[in-house]
Structures are given as structure tokens and as C-alpha cells.
């Protein structure tokens, strides 16, 4: 321990780690305050658990005047925990140590010089003799370390303290971390910001009249391109690198140049955060055809749109038609309207996004180019002002910058930052931060902290489903408030919140995929950490959390494009002990928000195609209440909100209802839980009756009806089909495709040219004829060979021919088999006999008296079939090892059976 003592005696500057971090952050422009303003966050875990008041306010950019030095408090806590004997030992050590310091001052030594040798070992020896642990030594002011923490008083091995919270040394005046874009993307240097606004009156669905115009798609042939992105990463390419600001160089002006003040051409733009528009074609004075950009590095998923128009005219009726949507069904067919944002309205009247549009029609594209079918969305609109800047969107945008501004305000709040810890979970493919929030009140004891259950919430795994972010914002607003219910929830739960799982997709304006070109919500089982870091680290974090404590609930916030209202997808539990328990939370949520949430739209069937989703993977990991919350892009068909669009406030209120339902779900008085469970059983009974009635069957449910599989009763979910977005990331898939193409080309070179059926038949007949002729020739050849064997054996006495002539007529296909292995009554293959011509049969029988030619299915002995006379050849028997005494050998040919005897 003495080197540590010597080091601390030398130090006159702040902690080296903090000094290094100060210089590092100052170099990159993130910190310009005084060194003394660094917050003291080296808090002992034991102190934090027993003294919640000592929890650091890590968000302040100045020295915390509200919270005293926690290390000083920690130092005062040690005497409470130690015995009187240890107190006396520590006091003796302190006296010895201070005497050492006094001797140094008396000798005029600098604090940077070590003590003399005779005092060198004295303090450390005293500590070792007293048996004081390292953590006790840290209580001394001169031995205190801000980087080493001890969980217990008798802990020997220290641990490094956790990094300081994000934004803890930033203020709201400092710039945020700029979003990183793929290097192929051009980005305009403008800050796009929208105000939040709730319309005072309900925004009703559009009521189709039946006479809506269906414009014919004409494209560039008859129209004029007024906006088009030059460089768009398409299918076949893949993400390589990113940078702040995207593509290097000067940002080109893609919109057309106006010819004068009378030119009424609209100026389009979408090269900003979450923007998505690839091309605009002017087909008439006030009519435009729009083409959306697909998700980067794919050719799919065109649903989300968000773009800007300028140079508007107030009294004109404009028509916009999006020509390349991919989903055959949409909420636009049942009255959903697009969103409009007027910059002049926001500046002058404080009015934000609102639903606008008439003559709305969703229909199939009439173009047939042999590719996948496209669908069109057309609507008309009148802009409120001349020369206005307006935005259109599929739903209320919520960008990555919006999230960072919100988290920065939380980190700089002196109260909220005490129970909300902000960390970096990981970095995305482009290098953007994936944030993790841990929200809980400090516990009084370690036992109380360990007894807390966890709740995991996440959003924006699909970047185009911005409604998930608004629900998450409503949840955070409530759980971080000073409401008594929020304080109670923080007392009994540890909340792990992932507000944006796919920041890259949100930044570039994707609808469903990440920069890997794949749907992240199908890869929660992945092992490819480098390709899917956000999902891999999320699953790993939850896995570690399950090892520490029970996770009561997991919920992933999504958006739905084909069904109205809000509903949940869950997982049926096969454990009879917890039968129907997974449906209690959704039913409670339905009761708390009856005009928004539809329990009858919920589904709990686990499909094979959903095995890679977060909901199913977390359920497989042991989280019983694992859900996907689907909030519609449209509105409600329930209660007082029937046939009205959802607003931002409606979605944020759902976040509050989630918190309220959590309290009901965990109420010590289980009356609500029991009532919901009984109601669920009755609903299930009615559903079973309905199913059997549809099948025309009658069933008695008074018995063990609960044994009926719930998956058989429920229909499949109407969720999105992302099968095309499964599989390897794009860069690996491209490599696999290249290898497959090379294999196909290699095989193609070996293959012969294709033939017609007539040619194949002629070739087949010719081949069969050649085989028959060959079999006939083999029969004559083998018969001649057998007659040769019957001649005088002296033929083999010639040394020159003895080794050559027998091999001359030897057929390599000759197979010798032991005749004793076949029963005498077993018939030979009749098909073999038919292949021998009658004339050859007679000739062979006449020329080979020493051989028996069997062409009949049964062996018989007659005058024409006499056994061969006994003779013993004078060549060594070892020359034919397969021949044994007393055994007959059969030389088998494709069309002939010849029996020889030794």
C-alpha cells in the first residue's frame, strides 16, 4: 500500500483521470468551464444506498452547492460502522501519520518529496498490523481516491467507479452531438424545427364521396422534373462510412430555378433529418407526382414521407400524388389525412401540425413494368398563405435531434437528474449514440435496492413509426415528474428506457430498416454484433438485468399503418399456473384508456415469422409480460374520440396511462387483478363458443375447456411482413450473392446447351439401342473367352503369353460371386435371359461343353447340360484366389450367367 501513499503525498493537482478528461473534452470543444466546476461523482455505492440525499446531481455544469461533498460524508460514515477497537487503531494510525507529516514540514521538505526511510514503512506497517482493509485507508483525507470504490467495508479488491453521466459537464447553451450521416447522403445546412401544438377541435376522418379523381400516372415523359436526388444508395450497395454533414463538398441546389416572381413552380426539399423524397415531377400547373426514396441500400419500404415545399400560392388548389407506395392496404382508404405544417402559421399564430387534404384516394398504380406492384396516394390541398414554407408528413415527425434536446434538458434539471441516469448503450453503425436511461429513486438499504423489479421500455426500432417516440415522451414526462404516483413507481421499480433504438434510420428518413438494410425487429436473436449493434447490446443488457432482478414487463412501442386505435401484441403462456396472466395488463390498460385502446384488437399468438422480434425473444428469455404496443397512424374508432385523428397529446397521454396501469397491475390489493382475470375467462369462453359456432359444431364448455389451446382460437396477427428484410446484412448478402453467381457460372460452363423434347427423345432411343448392341457383343465375346478356357491347358506354358492372353479378353466389369451364397432353388433374374438372342444361345451351348449356360429361372440337368469333366489345371491355384475346391464360381455379365468348375 505504500506506493499509493507515496503517490497521494506527491499530488497537488486534481485527480489524474479527471484532469485527463477535462483536457480531452476541452480539446474537442465540449467543455470550457473551470476545472473546479467538475462535479464530484465519485460516490461510494454503500453511501448512495444508505443516504439518498448524497445522490449526485451530475447534470450541473457548476460546482454543486446544494449537495455537500459526498466523499466527505463517506469519510464520516466509517466510524459508525466500525468497532471501538478499530476506532482506537485508526486513531493511532492517524497520529502516527500526522507526526510523519509534521516531521516533513519541520525539515522544510516539499510535499512532492517522499518521507525519509525511517518513517517510510511506518504508516503502512501500522495498517497491516491493525488489519485495516484498503477501504478503511481511503477514509483518510490524504489517502482518498476518487476512482476506486468498495462495495463492502471488508472488501479487499477495489473497483473503478462508473463513468460520469452524459451531459454532466454540458449546459443547454452548448451544441449537441451532431447527427452522423452516410457519406453518400447530401444534407442541407438548415435547422428544421417544429413546435408542438394540439388542435382545439377534434380532427375528423375524411369521408370518401365515391367520386374522387384517380389521376393517371404520366411520369417524366409528359412532365417536368423539378426535384431529384442525384446520389441515393440503392439495392446492391451497402453502408461503408459516415460523417457529420453527410457527403463532402458543396451542397447542390436540386430544386428548379424560378424564372421570376410570376413563376409558381413549387420548390421541393427533403435533404434534412428524417426527410424522405426522391423525385418530384410537375405534370400540370398545380399538379405534381412524387416518388419516395426507399430505405437506404434496399428497394423496399416506401411508406413514411416528410418533405418541404416553398413558393406556395394561397388561392390555388394543388394536387399531390405519391406513385410508389408498396402496401396494398392503408389507413388512407378509411379516412386518414396527411399532415400539413405552415411556417407562417407557426410564427404568427403558434399553430403546428394539422390534418389537411381533400379528394383523398389510395389506389393501385396503373403502370406495369414487370416489377412489384405499386400503389398511389393522391390528395388536394389549398395552402393558407402566399410565399409560405410548408411541410407534409405521414405522421408527426420526431427526430434524433429532438430526442437529444429532450435528454439534455433532463440532464440539466437539478431534480430529475438525481433519479434519472443517462448512459450510452452503444454506438450505431453510423456512430450515433444509442441512449439508455435508468430511472429509479435511491434505496435506503442494499436489500431494498435488490428487491426492486425492473421494467424495460423501448421505441423507434422502426424509424418511420414516430408515434412510438411520442408515447415514449409522454411516459418520460410523467415518470420524471414530482407526481405522487410517479414517485411511488420510482420507489418500487427500476426503469430501463431505450428511447430510440435505430437512430441511423431516423436520421436518414428510413421507414423500417437500419443502415444494414434489414429490419432490426427481426434480428433480436442475432450474433452479429458489428452489423446489428443496437439490438445486440439491448438483448445483452436485458440478459444481465435478468441475472440481477426480476423483469416484470417489457414493452416495445411501435406504429401501425392498417388498423386504427391502440393495441398490444403479447405471447400466450403455456404454464397453467399463469394461465391468461399475460392478458391482464392489456385489459387494465383498456379500462384506463377506453377511448383509445382496443382490447379486442390485441393478439397473443406467437407466429414462427415473429420469432426474431423483441417481444418473442424477451418472452423466451423469461419475461412473462412481453408486449409490442401498436399505436395507429390514424385515430380512434372508440368512445368519445370515434372517427377522429390522434394528436400528439393523445399519444403522450397513453404514456401516462401505461404508468397508471403499472400501479394497478402491481397493487398489493389483488382485487383488480382477480376481477380482470375472471373477466378474461368469460371473454375467452365467449370466443370459443363463437369459433365453434362458425365451424358448425356444438361444444360443452362446462368441463376442462381451459385446456383448449389459445393459439388455435386466435387468428394470425395482421402485422407487417418483413420476411424480405430478414437474413444477413446487406454487405454480407452481397458477398453471398456474388459467390452464388460464380458457382452458377461455373456450372453453366459445364452444362450442355438446352435441347428440345424431340431431340432428347431421339438421344434417349439412340442410347438404349447402343446399350443393347453392346450387350449382344459382350455375350459373344464372353462366350469365346469361355471356350478358350476349355482348350488344352498347355496354352499357358508359354511364358510370354501366360500372363498376357488371359487378360486379353478380361472384362473389367467381371464380378465373381460364390455360387454357394445362392440357394439352388432361387431363380435368376428373368430379365437377364431375355437379353440373349436364341441363335447365340444355341451356339454357345454347342461350343462350350464344359460350361453351363443358364437362361431359365430354374436349374435342371438334361442331355444338353452335362457337368464338366473333372480336370486339374497345372497352374498354381493361387493365381485365382477366388476359386476354392468343391465350389463352383459364377462369372456374372449383364446378360449371361456362366458356371465354371475347378
From Swiss-Prot:
UniProt xrefs under InterPro entries: Cytosolic_carboxypeptidase, Pepdidase_M14_N, Peptidase_M14
Comp. bias (Basic residues): 746-758
Sorted UniProt keywords: Carboxypeptidase, Cell projection, Cytoplasm, Cytoskeleton, Hydrolase, Metal-binding, Metalloprotease, Protease, Zinc
Regulation (activators, inhibitors): Inhibited by RARRES1.
SUPFAM superfamilies: Zn-dependent exopeptidases
Primary residence: cytoplasm
Keyword Membrane recorded: no
GO BP annotations, alphabetical order: protein side chain deglutamylation; proteolysis
Subcellular location as annotated: Cytoplasm, Cytosol; Cytoplasm, Cytoskeleton, Microtubule organizing center, Centrosome, Centriole; Cytoplasm, Cytoskeleton, Cilium basal body
Domain Peptidase M14 intervals: 396-666
Cofactors demanded by this protein: Zn(2+)
Cofactor note: Binds 1 zinc ion per subunit.
Active-site residues annotated for this sequence: 630
GO CC aspect terms: centriole; ciliary basal body; cytoplasm; cytosol; microtubule cytoskeleton
Record region (Disordered): 746-770, 796-879
Extent of Polar residues compositional bias: 853-866
Enzyme type, top EC level: hydrolase
Gene Ontology MF terms in the entry: metallocarboxypeptidase activity; tubulin binding; zinc ion binding
EC number(s) per entry: 3.4.17.-
Pfam families linked to this entry: Pepdidase_M14_N (PF18027), Peptidase_M14 (PF00246)
Record-listed Zn(2+) binding positions: 462, 465, 558
CDD domains to which the protein is assigned, alphabetical: M14_AGBL2-3_like
Quaternary state and interactors: Interacts with RARRES1, KIF11 AND MAPRE1.
Similarity comment: Belongs to the peptidase M14 family.
Protein name: Cytosolic carboxypeptidase 2
Species in which this protein is naturally found: Homo sapiens
Primary gene name: AGBL2
Amino acid at each position: 500500500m505504500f506506493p499509493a501513499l507515496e503517490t497521494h503525498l506527491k499530488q497537488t493537482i486534481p485527480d489524474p483521470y479527471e484532469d485527463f478528461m477535462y483536457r480531452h473534452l476541452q480539446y474537442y470543444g465540449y467543455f470550457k468551464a473551470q476545472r473546479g466546476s467538475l462535479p464530484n461523482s465519485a460516490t461510494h455505492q454503500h453511501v448512495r444506498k444508505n443516504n439518498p440525499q448524497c445522490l449526485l446531481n451530475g447534470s450541473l455544469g457548476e460546482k454543486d452547492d446544494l449537495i455537500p461533498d459526498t466523499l466527505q460524508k463517506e469519510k464520516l460514515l466509517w466510524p459508525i460502522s466500525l468497532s471501538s477497537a478499530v476506532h482506537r487503531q485508526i486513531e493511532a494510525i492517524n497520529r502516527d501519520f500526522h507526526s510523519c507529516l509534521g516531521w516533513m514540514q519541520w525539515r522544510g521538505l516539499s510535499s512532492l518529496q517522499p518521507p525519509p526511510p525511517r518513517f517510510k514503512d511506518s504508516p503502512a506497517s501500522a495498517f497491516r498490523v491493525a488489519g485495516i482493509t484498503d477501504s478503511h485507508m481511503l477514509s483518510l483525507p490524504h489517502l482518498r481516491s476518487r476512482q476506486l470504490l468498495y462495495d463492502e467495508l471488508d472488501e479487499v479488491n477495489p473497483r473503478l467507479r462508473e463513468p460520469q453521466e452524459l451531459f454532466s459537464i454540458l449546459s443547454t447553451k452548448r451544441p449537441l452531438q451532431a447527427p452522423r450521416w452516410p457519406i453518400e447522403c447530401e444534407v442541407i445546412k438548415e435547422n428544421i424545427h417544429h413546435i408542438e401544438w394540439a388542435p382545439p377541435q377534434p380532427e375528423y376522418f375524411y369521408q370518401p364521396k365515391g367520386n374522387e379523381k384517380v389521376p393517371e400516372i404520366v411520369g417524366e415523359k409528359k412532365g417536368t422534373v423539378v426535384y431529384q436526388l442525384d446520389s441515393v444508395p440503392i439495392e446492391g450497395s451497402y453502408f461503408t462510412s459516415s460523417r457529420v454533414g453527410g457527403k463532402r463538398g458543396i451542397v447542390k441546389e436540386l430544386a428548379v430555378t424560378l424564372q421570376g416572381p410570376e413563376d409558381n413552380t413549387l420548390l421541393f426539399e427533403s435533404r434534412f433529418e428524417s426527410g424522405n423524397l426522391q423525385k418530384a415531377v410537375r405534370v400540370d400547373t398545380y399538379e405534381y407526382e412524387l416518388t419516395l426514396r426507399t430505405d437506404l441500400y434496399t428497394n423496399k419500404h416506401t411508406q413514411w414521407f416528410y418533405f418541404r415545399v416553398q413558393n406556395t400560392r394561397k388561392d390555388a388548389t394543388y394536387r399531390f400524388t405519391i406513385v410508389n407506395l408498396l402496401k396494398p392496404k392503408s389507413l388512407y382508404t378509411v379516412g386518414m389525412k396527411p399532415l400539413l405544417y405552415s411556417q407562417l402559421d407557426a410564427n404568427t399564430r403558434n399553430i403546428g401540425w394539422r390534418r389537411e387534404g381533400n379528394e383523398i384516394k389510395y389506389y393501385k398504380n396503373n403502370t406495369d413494368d414487370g416489377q412489384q406492384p405499386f400503389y398511389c396516394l393522391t390528395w388536394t390541398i389549398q395552402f393558407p398563405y402566399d410565399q409560405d414554407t410548408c411541410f407534409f408528413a405521414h405522421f408527426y415527425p420526431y427526430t434524433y435531434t429532438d430526442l437529444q434536446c429532450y435528454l439534455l434538458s433532463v440532464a440539466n434539471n437539478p431534480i430529475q437528474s438525481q433519479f434519472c441516469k443517462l448512459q450510452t448503450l452503444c454506438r450505431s453503425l453510423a456512430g450515433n449514440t444509442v441512449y439508455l436511461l435508468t430511472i429509479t429513486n435511491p434505496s435506503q438499504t442494499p436489500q431494498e435496492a435488490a428487491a426492486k423489479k425492473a421494467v424495460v421500455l423501448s421505441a423507434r426500432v422502426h424509424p418511420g413509426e414516430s408515434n412510438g417516440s411520442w408515447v415514449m415522451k409522454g411516459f418520460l414526462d410523467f415518470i420524471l415528474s414530482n407526481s405522487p404516483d410517479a414517485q411511488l413507481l420510482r420507489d418500487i421499480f427500476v426503469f430501463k428506457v431505450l428511447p430510440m433504438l435505430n437512430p441511423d434510420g431516423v436520421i436518414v428518413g428510413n421507414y423500417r430498416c437500419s443502415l444494414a438494410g434489414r429490419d432490426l425487429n427481426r434480428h433480436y436473436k442475432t450474433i452479429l454484433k458489428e452489423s446489428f449493434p443496437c439490438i445486440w447490446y439491448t438483448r445483452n443488457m436485458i440478459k444481465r438485468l435478468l441475472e440481477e432482478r426480476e423483469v416484470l414487463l417489457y414493452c416495445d412501442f411501435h406504429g401501425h399503418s392498417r388498423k386504427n386505435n391502440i393495441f398490444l401484441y403479447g405471447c400466450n403462456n403455456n404454464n397453467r399456473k399463469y394461465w391468461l396472466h399475460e392478458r391482464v395488463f392489456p385489459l387494465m390498460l383498456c379500462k384506463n384508456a377506453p377511448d383509445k385502446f382496443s382490447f379486442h384488437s390485441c393478439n397473443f399468438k406467437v407466429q414462427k415469422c415473429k420469432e426474431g422480434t423483441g417481444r418473442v425473444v424477451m418472452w423466451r428469455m423469461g419475461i412473462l409480460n412481453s408486449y409490442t404496443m401498436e399505436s395507429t397512424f390514424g385515430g380512434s374508432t372508440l368512445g368519445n374520440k370515434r372517427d377522429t385523428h390522434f394528436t400528439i397529446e393523445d399519444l403522450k397521454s397513453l404514456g401516462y396511462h401505461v404508468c397508471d396501469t403499472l400501479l394497478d397491475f402491481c397493487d398489493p390489493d389483488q382485487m383488480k387483478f382477480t376481477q380482470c382475470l375472471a373477466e378474461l375467462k368469460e371473454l375467452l369462453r365467449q370466443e370459443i363458443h363463437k369459433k365453434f359456432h362458425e365451424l358448425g359444431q356444438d361444444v360443452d364448455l362446462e368441463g376442462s375447456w381451459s385446456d383448449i389451446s389459445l393459439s388455435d382460437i386466435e387468428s394470425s396477427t395482421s402485422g407487417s411482413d418483413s420476411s424480405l428484410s430478414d437474413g444477413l446484412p446487406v454487405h454480407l448478402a452481397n458477398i453471398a450473392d456474388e459467390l452464388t453467381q460464380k458457382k452458377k457460372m461455373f456450372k453453366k460452363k459445364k452444362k450442355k446447351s438446352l435441347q428440345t423434347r424431340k431431340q432428347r427423345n431421339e438421344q434417349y432411343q439412340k442410347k438404349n439401342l447402343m446399350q443393347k448392341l453392346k450387350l449382344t457383343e459382350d455375350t459373344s465375346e464372353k462366350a469365346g473367352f469361355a471356350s478358350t478356357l476349355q482348350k488344352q491347358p498347355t496354352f499357358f506354358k508359354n511364358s510370354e503369353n501366360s500372363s498376357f492372353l488371359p487378360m486379353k479378353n478380361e472384362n473389367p466389369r467381371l464380378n465373381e460371386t460364390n455360387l454357394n451364397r445362392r440357394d439352388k432353388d432361387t431363380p435368376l433374374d428373368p430379365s437377364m435371359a431375355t437379353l440373349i438372342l436364341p441363335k447365340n444361345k444355341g451356339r454357345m451351348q454347342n461350343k462350350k461343353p464344359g460350361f453351363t449356360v443358364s437362361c431359365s429361372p430354374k436349374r435342371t440337368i438334361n442331355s444338353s447340360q452335362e457337368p464338366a469333366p473333372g480336370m486339374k489345371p497345372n497352374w498354381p491355384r493361387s493365381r485365382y484366389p477366388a476359386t476354392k475346391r468343391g465350389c463352383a464360381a459364377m462369372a456374372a455379365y449383364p446378360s449371361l450367367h456362366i458356371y465354371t468348375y475347378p
